Amino acid sequence: SIDHHIALEVAERLQQRFGNRYTLDNVIISATHTHSGPGGYWQSRSDSGLDGGLYPEHFEAIAAGITASIVKADDDLQPGIIFINSGRVANAGANRSAVAYEENPPAERARYRENTNTEMLLLKFVDDSGAIGMLNWYALHPTAMNFHNHLISGDHKGYASLQMEQQHGTRYASATDFVAAFAQADP
């Protein structure tokens, strides 16, 4: 998740560059959950012993990276079209705690088709040259990496982003690269 202090830092940096064009009232910063990410960037949480406390260098790298991505997007502002679509993706995941889910009141369970959310939502961003990006939400908990993993990973959502971007020719070197984001839906 994004710590509130990172959001505040990014907003301050954006205001230094753009004035009041971007503020906490009109910028949404979202992170995709992973069990394979580094810690050390939370200022609002006590030291859990798992991440060793605050690492200013890591905090700076995250705040600078988010700020740079927003500046890059602002530099490329242009008219475009946003398409939206949704659909059902069956058999792609499982409820991590089906027993606990069954303890929900019957009225709550009756609201849903299954014990997991199988709906996927997709936004597609298009300009005069074609598709320039996509944003996808699907409720699949990113725990594909096991406990023996010692590497930083975006898990299956990061891998999906990488694959989608490569299919669209992204080389991470130009302002016109396709951007794919597979965001976290339900927790």
Give the residues covered by each predicted segment.
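Conserved beta-alpha junction segments in alpha/beta enzyme cores
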Residues: 1-187
